[in-house]
Amino acid sequence: MKPPQRGRGGGVRGGRGLARGGEGSAVRGSGRGGESGRGRGPGRVKSESDGGIKGGSKVLVTPHRHAGVFVAKSKADALVTKNLVPGEIIYNEKRIFVQNEDRSTVEYRVWNPHRSKLADAITTGVDNIWIKPGVKVLYLGASSGYTVSHVSDIVGPEGCVYAVEHSDICGKVLMNMAEKRTNVIPIIEDARHPAKYRMLVGMVDIIFSDVNHPEQANILSLNASYFLKSGGHFMISIKANSIDSTIAAETVYQMEVEKLQMEELRPTEILHLDSCEEKHACVFGGYRLPRK
Protein backbone atom coordinates (compact mmCIF):
# COMPACT_ATOMS: atom_id res chain seq x y z
CA MET A 1 0.00 0.00 0.00
CA LYS A 2 1.32 3.44 -0.85
CA PRO A 3 1.50 6.15 1.81
CA PRO A 4 -1.20 8.79 1.73
CA GLN A 5 -0.58 11.56 -0.75
CA ARG A 6 -2.33 14.71 -1.90
CA GLY A 7 -6.00 14.15 -2.66
CA ARG A 8 -6.20 10.65 -1.20
CA GLY A 9 -5.30 8.53 1.80
CA GLY A 10 -7.75 9.76 4.38
CA GLY A 11 -6.90 13.45 4.22
CA VAL A 12 -3.14 13.15 4.53
CA ARG A 13 -1.67 15.20 1.74
CA GLY A 14 1.81 15.42 0.32
CA GLY A 15 3.92 18.53 -0.11
CA ARG A 16 4.28 20.18 -3.48
CA GLY A 17 8.06 20.30 -3.37
CA LEU A 18 8.57 24.06 -3.62
CA ALA A 19 11.79 25.39 -2.21
CA ARG A 20 10.37 28.87 -1.73
CA GLY A 21 8.50 30.45 1.16
CA GLY A 22 5.69 32.63 -0.01
CA GLU A 23 1.98 32.23 0.35
CA GLY A 24 1.77 28.99 -1.61
CA SER A 25 0.58 25.92 0.26
CA ALA A 26 2.16 22.51 0.23
CA VAL A 27 -1.32 21.02 0.43
CA ARG A 28 -3.27 23.07 -2.03
CA GLY A 29 -0.69 22.72 -4.75
CA SER A 30 -1.01 26.30 -5.91
CA GLY A 31 1.42 29.19 -5.59
CA ARG A 32 0.11 32.55 -4.44
CA GLY A 33 3.27 34.44 -3.71
CA GLY A 34 7.02 34.42 -3.33
CA GLU A 35 9.40 34.10 -0.46
CA SER A 36 8.32 37.32 1.16
CA GLY A 37 5.32 35.66 2.84
CA ARG A 38 2.10 37.35 3.79
CA GLY A 39 1.50 41.01 3.60
CA ARG A 40 4.48 42.47 5.51
CA GLY A 41 6.61 44.73 3.42
CA PRO A 42 10.35 44.00 3.70
CA GLY A 43 13.01 46.67 3.84
CA ARG A 44 16.22 46.54 1.85
CA VAL A 45 19.22 46.32 4.10
CA LYS A 46 22.96 45.85 3.90
CA SER A 47 24.81 42.74 4.97
CA GLU A 48 27.85 43.14 7.22
CA SER A 49 29.03 39.52 7.11
CA ASP A 50 29.05 36.63 4.69
CA GLY A 51 26.15 34.61 6.17
CA GLY A 52 25.86 32.66 2.94
CA ILE A 53 25.60 35.96 1.11
CA LYS A 54 28.64 37.91 0.02
CA GLY A 55 29.68 40.42 2.67
CA GLY A 56 28.90 44.00 1.86
CA SER A 57 26.33 43.10 -0.77
CA LYS A 58 22.80 44.43 -0.55
CA VAL A 59 20.49 41.86 0.95
CA LEU A 60 16.73 41.72 1.18
CA VAL A 61 15.51 39.98 4.34
CA THR A 62 11.82 39.13 4.17
CA PRO A 63 9.46 37.23 6.47
CA HIS A 64 8.72 33.69 5.38
CA ARG A 65 5.07 32.62 5.55
CA HIS A 66 6.02 30.56 8.63
CA ALA A 67 6.12 33.08 11.49
CA GLY A 68 9.57 33.55 12.96
CA VAL A 69 11.36 32.28 9.84
CA PHE A 70 12.94 34.62 7.29
CA VAL A 71 14.54 34.49 3.86
CA ALA A 72 17.71 36.45 3.06
CA LYS A 73 17.65 37.15 -0.67
CA SER A 74 20.70 38.03 -2.71
CA LYS A 75 22.67 36.12 -5.35
CA ALA A 76 22.18 33.06 -3.16
CA ASP A 77 19.03 32.86 -1.03
CA ALA A 78 19.28 31.59 2.53
CA LEU A 79 16.78 30.50 5.16
CA VAL A 80 17.48 32.41 8.39
CA THR A 81 16.15 32.95 11.90
CA LYS A 82 16.56 36.04 14.07
CA ASN A 83 19.26 35.34 16.67
CA LEU A 84 17.70 35.17 20.13
CA VAL A 85 21.12 35.85 21.67
CA PRO A 86 22.88 38.41 19.44
CA GLY A 87 26.62 37.94 19.29
CA GLU A 88 26.44 34.26 20.19
CA ILE A 89 26.92 31.50 17.61
CA ILE A 90 26.18 27.82 18.13
CA TYR A 91 28.01 25.83 15.47
CA ASN A 92 30.09 28.39 13.60
CA GLU A 93 27.02 29.15 11.54
CA LYS A 94 27.09 32.07 9.16
CA ARG A 95 25.35 35.24 10.25
CA ILE A 96 23.85 38.22 8.52
CA PHE A 97 23.74 41.63 10.17
CA VAL A 98 21.21 44.07 8.77
CA GLN A 99 20.68 47.69 9.60
CA ASN A 100 17.17 49.07 9.81
CA GLU A 101 16.13 52.58 8.87
CA ASP A 102 16.35 53.61 12.53
CA ARG A 103 20.01 52.42 12.50
CA SER A 104 19.27 49.51 14.83
CA THR A 105 20.98 46.24 13.86
CA VAL A 106 19.31 42.86 13.63
CA GLU A 107 21.33 39.65 13.57
CA TYR A 108 20.14 36.59 11.64
CA ARG A 109 21.55 33.05 11.67
CA VAL A 110 21.66 30.99 8.48
CA TRP A 111 19.70 27.73 8.77
CA ASN A 112 21.09 24.94 6.62
CA PRO A 113 18.38 22.55 5.28
CA HIS A 114 21.05 19.90 4.68
CA ARG A 115 21.63 19.70 8.44
CA SER A 116 18.09 20.13 9.73
CA LYS A 117 14.99 18.11 8.83
CA LEU A 118 12.73 20.95 9.91
CA ALA A 119 14.55 23.42 7.65
CA ASP A 120 14.40 20.82 4.87
CA ALA A 121 10.64 20.50 5.34
CA ILE A 122 10.24 24.27 5.14
CA THR A 123 12.21 24.56 1.90
CA THR A 124 10.35 21.54 0.51
CA GLY A 125 7.08 23.41 1.01
CA VAL A 126 5.39 22.11 4.18
CA ASP A 127 1.97 23.66 4.71
CA ASN A 128 2.34 24.42 8.42
CA ILE A 129 5.11 23.71 10.93
CA TRP A 130 2.94 24.94 13.84
CA ILE A 131 6.06 26.31 15.53
CA LYS A 132 5.75 30.07 15.95
CA PRO A 133 6.59 32.81 18.45
CA GLY A 134 5.32 32.14 21.95
CA VAL A 135 4.54 28.41 21.68
CA LYS A 136 5.88 25.59 23.84
CA VAL A 137 7.68 22.76 22.04
CA LEU A 138 8.78 19.32 23.20
CA TYR A 139 11.71 18.22 21.04
CA LEU A 140 12.49 14.49 21.23
CA GLY A 141 15.91 13.48 19.93
CA ALA A 142 17.48 16.91 20.33
CA SER A 143 21.03 15.66 19.60
CA SER A 144 23.54 18.48 20.14
CA GLY A 145 20.94 21.14 19.50
CA TYR A 146 21.43 22.41 15.94
CA THR A 147 17.73 22.49 15.03
CA VAL A 148 16.77 23.18 18.65
CA SER A 149 18.70 26.45 18.51
CA HIS A 150 16.71 27.64 15.50
CA VAL A 151 13.43 26.55 17.10
CA SER A 152 14.58 28.60 20.10
CA ASP A 153 14.98 31.61 17.78
CA ILE A 154 11.50 31.07 16.33
CA VAL A 155 9.53 30.68 19.57
CA GLY A 156 11.41 33.60 21.10
CA PRO A 157 11.61 34.69 24.75
CA GLU A 158 7.90 34.07 25.35
CA GLY A 159 8.14 30.48 24.10
CA CYS A 160 9.91 27.42 25.42
CA VAL A 161 11.72 24.37 24.02
CA TYR A 162 11.99 21.23 26.15
CA ALA A 163 14.88 19.38 24.51
CA VAL A 164 15.16 15.65 25.31
CA GLU A 165 18.38 13.84 24.42
CA HIS A 166 19.58 10.43 25.64
CA SER A 167 23.27 10.66 24.71
CA ASP A 168 25.53 12.07 27.42
CA ILE A 169 27.98 13.38 24.82
CA CYS A 170 25.36 15.28 22.82
CA GLY A 171 23.67 16.24 26.07
CA LYS A 172 26.74 18.14 27.27
CA VAL A 173 26.80 20.21 24.09
CA LEU A 174 23.06 20.79 24.41
CA MET A 175 23.42 21.98 28.00
CA ASN A 176 26.22 24.38 27.06
CA MET A 177 24.02 25.87 24.36
CA ALA A 178 21.12 26.25 26.81
CA GLU A 179 23.23 28.30 29.23
CA LYS A 180 22.80 31.33 26.98
CA ARG A 181 19.40 30.40 25.53
CA THR A 182 17.13 30.62 28.54
CA ASN A 183 14.08 29.40 26.62
CA VAL A 184 15.73 25.98 26.09
CA ILE A 185 15.36 23.40 28.87
CA PRO A 186 17.75 20.47 28.24
CA ILE A 187 16.63 17.08 29.55
CA ILE A 188 19.16 14.26 29.41
CA GLU A 189 16.81 11.29 29.43
CA ASP A 190 15.50 8.48 27.23
CA ALA A 191 12.45 9.61 25.24
CA ARG A 192 11.05 6.08 25.60
CA HIS A 193 10.40 6.80 29.28
CA PRO A 194 8.59 10.14 29.60
CA ALA A 195 7.54 9.32 33.16
CA LYS A 196 11.15 10.00 34.17
CA TYR A 197 10.92 13.65 33.11
CA ARG A 198 7.22 14.34 33.64
CA MET A 199 8.01 16.75 36.49
CA LEU A 200 10.22 18.85 34.20
CA VAL A 201 7.90 19.31 31.23
CA GLY A 202 4.66 21.27 31.14
CA MET A 203 1.88 20.87 28.60
CA VAL A 204 3.12 21.77 25.13
CA ASP A 205 1.62 23.00 21.86
CA ILE A 206 3.71 20.79 19.58
CA ILE A 207 5.96 17.74 19.76
CA PHE A 208 8.82 17.44 17.31
CA SER A 209 10.08 13.85 17.26
CA ASP A 210 13.39 12.99 15.63
CA VAL A 211 14.15 9.74 17.46
CA ASN A 212 15.99 7.21 15.32
CA HIS A 213 14.30 4.09 16.73
CA PRO A 214 12.12 1.26 15.36
CA GLU A 215 9.39 2.19 17.88
CA GLN A 216 9.44 5.90 17.11
CA ALA A 217 5.67 6.11 16.50
CA ASN A 218 5.00 4.58 19.92
CA ILE A 219 7.54 6.94 21.51
CA LEU A 220 5.70 9.92 20.05
CA SER A 221 2.26 8.68 21.12
CA LEU A 222 3.44 7.97 24.67
CA ASN A 223 4.94 11.45 25.04
CA ALA A 224 1.80 12.96 23.53
CA SER A 225 -0.32 11.24 26.18
CA TYR A 226 1.77 12.94 28.87
CA PHE A 227 2.47 16.37 27.46
CA LEU A 228 0.63 17.34 24.25
CA LYS A 229 -2.45 19.52 24.54
CA SER A 230 -5.65 18.32 22.92
CA GLY A 231 -5.75 20.12 19.59
CA GLY A 232 -1.95 20.37 19.61
CA HIS A 233 0.27 19.29 16.74
CA PHE A 234 3.22 17.06 15.99
CA MET A 235 5.98 16.40 13.51
CA ILE A 236 7.70 13.03 13.33
CA SER A 237 10.75 12.23 11.25
CA ILE A 238 10.61 8.70 9.82
CA LYS A 239 13.75 6.97 8.57
CA ALA A 240 12.45 3.90 6.76
CA ASN A 241 15.64 1.85 7.08
CA SER A 242 15.66 2.28 10.86
CA ILE A 243 12.25 0.64 11.09
CA ASP A 244 12.44 -2.09 8.45
CA SER A 245 15.06 -2.13 5.71
CA THR A 246 13.60 -5.28 4.10
CA ILE A 247 10.47 -3.63 2.71
CA ALA A 248 9.78 -0.61 0.53
CA ALA A 249 10.06 2.79 2.20
CA GLU A 250 6.54 3.68 1.05
CA THR A 251 5.17 0.67 2.92
CA VAL A 252 7.04 1.68 6.07
CA TYR A 253 5.60 5.20 5.93
CA GLN A 254 2.07 3.81 5.59
CA MET A 255 2.59 1.47 8.54
CA GLU A 256 3.79 4.34 10.73
CA VAL A 257 0.88 6.55 9.69
CA GLU A 258 -1.56 3.81 10.68
CA LYS A 259 0.13 3.45 14.08
CA LEU A 260 -0.25 7.18 14.68
CA GLN A 261 -3.92 7.14 13.71
CA MET A 262 -4.60 4.45 16.30
CA GLU A 263 -3.28 6.77 19.03
CA GLU A 264 -5.40 9.84 18.20
CA LEU A 265 -2.52 11.38 16.26
CA ARG A 266 -4.12 12.43 12.99
CA PRO A 267 -1.59 12.86 10.15
CA THR A 268 -2.46 15.67 7.77
CA GLU A 269 0.66 15.91 5.63
CA ILE A 270 3.62 13.77 4.64
CA LEU A 271 6.77 15.11 2.99
CA HIS A 272 9.55 13.10 1.41
CA LEU A 273 12.86 14.74 2.32
CA ASP A 274 16.00 14.33 0.25
CA SER A 275 18.40 16.96 1.54
CA CYS A 276 19.23 15.26 4.85
CA GLU A 277 18.92 11.54 4.15
CA GLU A 278 17.53 9.10 1.62
CA LYS A 279 14.35 7.14 2.36
CA HIS A 280 13.31 9.75 4.85
CA ALA A 281 9.93 11.38 5.38
CA CYS A 282 8.34 13.78 7.84
CA VAL A 283 4.74 13.45 8.93
CA PHE A 284 2.83 16.43 10.32
CA GLY A 285 -0.53 16.31 12.05
CA GLY A 286 -2.73 17.06 15.04
CA TYR A 287 -3.58 15.40 18.33
CA ARG A 288 -7.13 14.71 19.44
CA LEU A 289 -8.44 17.10 16.85
CA PRO A 290 -12.19 17.78 16.89
CA ARG A 291 -14.03 15.74 14.33
CA LYS A 292 -15.44 17.71 11.42
UniProtKB/Swiss-Prot annotation:
It catalyses: L-glutaminyl-[histone H2A] + S-adenosyl-L-methionine = N(5)-methyl-L-glutaminyl-[histone H2A] + S-adenosyl-L-homocysteine + H(+). InterPro entries: Fibrillarin, SAM-dependent_MTases_sf. Not detectable by RT-PCR. SMART domains: Fibrillarin. One of its GO terms (molecular function) is RNA binding. Keywords: Methyltransferase, Nucleus, Ribonucleoprotein, RNA-binding, rRNA processing, S-adenosyl-L-methionine, Transferase. Residues 7-42 have a biased composition (Gly residues). S-adenosyl-L-methionine binds at residues 146-147, 165-166, 190-191, 210-213. Its EC number is 2.1.1.-. GO terms for biological process: methylation; rRNA processing. It is an enzyme of class 2 (transferase). It is found in: Nucleus, Nucleolus. Residues 1-58 are annotated as: Disordered. GO terms for cellular component: nucleolus; ribonucleoprotein complex. Component of box C/D small nucleolar ribonucleoprotein (snoRNP) particles. Belongs to the methyltransferase superfamily. Fibrillarin family. NCBIfam families: PRK04266.1-2 (NF003276). S-adenosyl-L-methionine-dependent methyltransferase that has the ability to methylate both RNAs and proteins. Involved in pre-rRNA processing. Utilizes the methyl donor S-adenosyl-L-methionine to catalyze the site-specific 2'-hydroxyl methylation of ribose moieties in pre-ribosomal RNA. Site specificity is provided by a guide RNA that base pairs with the substrate. Methylation occurs at a characteristic distance from the sequence involved in base pairing with the guide RNA. PANTHER family: RRNA 2'-O-METHYLTRANSFERASE FIBRILLARIN 1-RELATED, RRNA 2-O-METHYLTRANSFERASE FIBRILLARIN. This is Putative rRNA 2'-O-methyltransferase fibrillarin 3. It comes from Arabidopsis thaliana. The gene is FIB3.
